[in-house]
């Protein structure tokens, strides 16, 4: 998510706030300094201007990204210092209570690599589910199939699989309508004389997807 975001009603704003002194300097940070979290997630009631800190700065309590699900809950990812679990998706109430893991990033059972869920879309007309993508193969950013994730049951439903492509093309992303339905996708040339020069767009019919 962005560094600040209004809730659906506009009554609350969530912000990532630095806990460090704002100093303008250029230096080479050590790895430990780069990994140390210096930001916390704060939700402020704009009607009363009362802030509430939702996260800390340690690996076990730090929030890395966030998006509003509704006026009561946010979807968050946690600090990457927690390992694979830093890529899992969680919900948390706007008052900082009831942190719940929705879906876990995990090792593939039969091959190397990890399976990582990414948020694709939150639709107010579908309050009980969100659209996510999950990588089908070991490379995290390739072959990311689309799923609905039920916020109550935590179960996923496959919507669309990345289709087979010519050897020189690589899948770039889905084209979705306002209901989260995939209508097309884009690719780019990764090999051959048009490498990096050609982007293609395809129509997609989820009814015929196998």
Where are the regions that the model predicts?
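Beta-propeller folds
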Residues: 1-210
């Amino acid at each position: 998510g962005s560094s600040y975001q209004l809730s659906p009603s506009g009554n609350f704003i969530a912000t990532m706030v630095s806990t460090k002194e704002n100093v303008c300097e250029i230096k080479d940070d050590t790895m430990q300094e780069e990994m140390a979290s210096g930001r916390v997630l704060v939700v402020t009631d704009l009607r009363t201007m009362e802030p509430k800190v939702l996260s800390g700065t340690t690996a076990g309590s730090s929030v890395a990204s966030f998006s509003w699900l509704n006026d009561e809950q946010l979807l968050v990812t946690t600090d990457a210092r927690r390992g694979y679990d830093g890529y899992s998706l969680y919900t948390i109430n706007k008052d900082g209570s009831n942190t719940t893991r929705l879906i876990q990033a995990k090792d593939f059972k039969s091959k190397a690599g990890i399976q990582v869920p990414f948020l694709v879309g939150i639709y107010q007309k579908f309050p009980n589910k969100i659209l996510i993508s999950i990588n089908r193969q070991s490379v995290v950013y390739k072959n990311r199939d689309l799923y609905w994730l039920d916020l109550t049951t935590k179960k996923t439903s496959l919507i669309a699989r990345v289709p087979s492509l010519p050897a020189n093309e690589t899948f770039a992303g889905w084209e979705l309508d306002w209901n989260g339905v995939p209508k097309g996708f884009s690719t780019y040339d990764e090999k051959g004389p048009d490498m990096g020069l050609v982007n293609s767009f395809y129509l997609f019919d989820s009814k015929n997807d196998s």
